[in-house]
């Protein structure tokens, strides 16, 4: 079969029309060095600071050092199989994590991927881990309480919604226990919680998750885990990921609580990354921007006003303020709060709860040192009944410590001094509390009323906690309406005081403890 020139021309034209080629332009680079989770890349000319770089094997690195002829990036995950000459490419994206209600009750890693074996997460969307904190005009003053359930904290060092309250102390003195109890106590309050574990043992994280589940608190909690076996990059970024997940609720007019456990280990991970990137070391070998590392994170915890929420949700949510309350944890070495990272975080936060090993070992748990613990803004947020009845607690403890030191040298004491000492001993004993047993507002109010009005006089020290437990049981069964009123309103007036006085007088007469 012979084709004439016209047919050949038509055939060629048809083939040309059907020809389809897709071209893709991408910015590609080559790994020139791999060192302990840090890679140096040549050829990525227009990469952004903090941009995700795609590596072989569906992994990513984050660009941290942008130099004249190379890029220093930190690998998110395993890096042992990366080698010199491997091709990488820029993505044009900043690191984002999933957010939304679907994350509640789940355990995720720094990237928001589930690690609890409960299947995929249907997230509401993705948001960047690094965000700018709300401005001055967008904020509102702190005036609503976050009840931790601890008598010593809620009475003396109250925490408000949108506050940053540091929990600081040596290892093994109850820092995590206090934070976990605060999360457990938010059950039924509508406050969503985020627990960020940085550099913890995997067994410790598993134990926390188990305890939250046992006490019905996992349903309102997101656990972000970057255990000690994870890379330094994942440990450094975990608090920012958790913060973004918490901000989702804040920006939609809800209240959230986030625990960073702990920021000392995050600073160590960041120091490791910085030294490997050959950034100049400063005090204690930390890089120069370690203050900014924590300040830009903790400034994102805030109470935002109605206008901010309305603008953020495009008018969907009106008349609601949102808040993100932060409880950062810092571990000190031998009680040294003047080290670099502790002083940084103390200066950033709105107060600190200082836990002491000596008090912990003496059986005073929670081991709160009332003398140097402070809440700078929480007083305005305190519940009325606890503010009114708890006011004398700090003073009683301060006087007791002063007199206890003096009485070691004085042989005989006058009656007034002895009475103050005994009152201080009773207050110290009453402030003790078991783990995983946070108190309601009414139960706490009853305990504070008992010590304030002298109902603990004449009770042996070793019987005070038994007296308190029996009193709570009696009040919740015999005076349920009064307890319900106090729990719902948090008010304290002459009528409530009179009813409490009658109830405690009757209870003390029964001698049932």
Swiss-Prot record:
The record marks 373 as: Required for activity. This is ATP synthase subunit alpha. F-type ATPases have 2 components, CF(1) - the catalytic core - and CF(0) - the membrane proton channel. CF(1) has five subunits: alpha(3), beta(3), gamma(1), delta(1), epsilon(1). CF(0) has three main subunits: a(1), b(2) and c(9-12). The alpha and beta chains form an alternating ring which encloses part of the gamma chain. CF(1) is attached to CF(0) by a central stalk formed by the gamma and epsilon chains, while a peripheral stalk is formed by the delta and b chains. It is found in: Cell inner membrane. Its EC number is 7.1.2.2. One of its GO terms (cellular component) is proton-transporting ATP synthase complex. ATP binds at residues 169-176. The lineage of its organism: Bacteria, Pseudomonadati, Pseudomonadota, Gammaproteobacteria, Alteromonadales. It is a peripheral membrane protein. It comes from Alteromonas mediterranea (strain DSM 17117 / CIP 110805 / LMG 28347 / Deep ecotype). NCBIfam families: atpA, PRK13343.1. PROSITE patterns: ATPASE_ALPHA_BETA. It holds the Pfam family ATP-synt_ab_N. The keyword Cell membrane applies. The gene is atpA. It catalyses: ATP + H2O + 4 H(+)(in) = ADP + phosphate + 5 H(+)(out). CDD domains: ATP-synt_F1_alpha_C, ATP-synt_F1_alpha_N, F1-ATPase_alpha_CD. Belongs to the ATPase alpha/beta chains family.
